[in-house]
């Protein structure tokens, strides 16, 4: 019932009218399409091919290169002096959050209202060039993200391919347990409690029953940054996390974590989580394990920058900018230690559809554009469990293709200038001529 209500409400909005014609088409009804542009990104090779063409048929890429076969009846789309590249991937989003007081919106807005807003967020992310995402928790909206995912998959509303987690998992008094509110008001947690191994297993099974694709666990609590020193308490032991990872693996699924620093990040790496999100500070041992186990760090710089720029006071802004600079310095150490990276922005508290800023910041803080694009597209596809399906322009891959103004290898800000979006062979954003 919720799925039908959300889909109907979303499609009824005027801003969706221009997109509904795309939903009426099926893969089998579309003729072959040839995308032509001035350039094409070779992700694995870290180079630009010029000119670039992609042949799309039945929602998948048939061929890509400087020139492709032109089957009879194919529709040619000339995208001009732009770069064809795979759709962007964000492995850390919050579709159920929007700019404003995060704690208040989760209390004041009903789950149906937040779900409708989440459909708009999904649309905005897709229009921003993000064709696949990992939603890292509804922050108190339970499993409502499964309705959004399912509506997208059924072609009822526009949005990226989604991996969803439902409510994140947290301890009593932990990171999302309404600790800033008057305890006498008994404000509900934005996460689901699990305080021991037995509760972890029960919650994980319940989350999967409700449709979660993976489990999101808050491994670290409230961060402290004073006099240039960063600290954060762990919330689950390595044994508890390992149990969670094992239980998820039992049904072929994975565990993601919010983990900003030691020792929680070490416990997460030891347990074998799919990625370590935020990763403000990592020990040498943690970095070694991440490198050996191929566990990527997901720095989420954009949310830190946004909070610093929109702080409640000048003093708070100064402190948050100092903490961001600290994280940037730690990021350089992680790069030097060959820690794998993936790209996640933590979008939600800042406007959806603008999170390509994350790639820009990762270059600003030390990565080469080609390496950031590999982190986003190749490592991102692996984190989402869609490796060899998305993240590159190869025969057999899903036709998730965008076109950007400029050359992202020369100027990474090109990824913020998305002119064209195709997902699964369906055009959702047409380039202006």
Where are these regions (language model features)?
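Histidine-rich, glycine-flanked metal-binding segment
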Residues: 27-31, 40, 45-85
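Divalent metal-dependent hydrolysis catalytic cores, especially in the metallo-beta-lactamase
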Residues: 118-143, 158-168, 212-223, 254, ...
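Active-site mouth loops of central-metabolism enzymes
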Residues: 104-116, 179-202, 254-256
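Bacterial N-terminal signal peptides
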Residues: 4-21
């Amino acid at each position: 019932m919720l799925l039908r209500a959300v889909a109907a409400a979303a499609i009824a909005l005027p801003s969706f009218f221009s997109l509904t014609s795309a939903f009426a088409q099926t893969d089998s009804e579309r003729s072959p399409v040839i995308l032509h542009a001035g350039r094409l990104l070779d992700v694995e090779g870290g180079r630009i091919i010029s000119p670039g063409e992609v042949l799309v048929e039945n929602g998948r890429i048939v061929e890509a290169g400087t020139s492709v076969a032109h089957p009879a009846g194919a529709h040619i789309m000339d995208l001009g002096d732009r770069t064809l590249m795979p759709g962007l991937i964000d492995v850390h989003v919050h579709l159920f959050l929007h700019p404003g007081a995060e704690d208040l919106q989760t209390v004041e807005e009903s789950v149906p209202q937040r779900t409708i807003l989440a459909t708009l967020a999904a649309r905005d992310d897709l229009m921003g060039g993000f064709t696949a995402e990992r939603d890292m928790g509804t922050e108190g909206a339970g499993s409502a993200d499964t309705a959004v995912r399912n509506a997208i998959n059924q072609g009822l509303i526009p949005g990226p391919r989604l991996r969803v987690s439902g409510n994140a998992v947290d301890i009593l008094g932990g990171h999302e347990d309404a600790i800033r509110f008057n305890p006498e008001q008994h404000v509900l947690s934005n996460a689901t409690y699990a305080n021991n191994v037995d509760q972890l297993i029960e919650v994980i099974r319940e989350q999967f029953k409700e449709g979660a694709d993976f489990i999101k666990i808050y491994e670290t609590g409230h961060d402290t940054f004073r006099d240039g020193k960063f600290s954060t308490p762990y919330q689950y032991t390595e044994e508890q996390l390992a149990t969670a990872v094992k239980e998820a693996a039992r049904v072929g699924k994975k565990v993601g974590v919010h983990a900003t620093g030691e020792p929680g990040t070490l416990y997460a790496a030891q347990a074998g989580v799919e990625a370590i999100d935020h990763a403000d500070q990592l020990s040498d041992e943690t970095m070694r394990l991440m490198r050996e186990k191929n566990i990527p760090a997901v720095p989420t710089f954009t949310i830190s920058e946004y909070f610093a720029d929109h702080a409640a006071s000048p003093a708070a802004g100064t402190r948050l900018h100092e903490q961001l600079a600290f994280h940037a310095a730690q990021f350089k150490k992680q790069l030097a230690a060959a820690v794998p990276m993936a790209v996640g922005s933590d979008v939600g508290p800042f406007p959806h559809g603008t999170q390509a800023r994350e790639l820009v910041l990762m270059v600003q803080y030390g990565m080469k554009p080609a390496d950031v694009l590999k982190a986003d597209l190749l490592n991102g596809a692996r984190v989402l469990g869609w490796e060899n399906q998305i993240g590159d322009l190869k025969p057999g891959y899903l036709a998730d293709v965008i076109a950007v103004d400029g050359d992202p290898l020369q100027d990474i800000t090109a990824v913020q200038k998305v002119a064209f979006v195709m997902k699964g062979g369906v055009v959702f954003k047409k380039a202006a001529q």
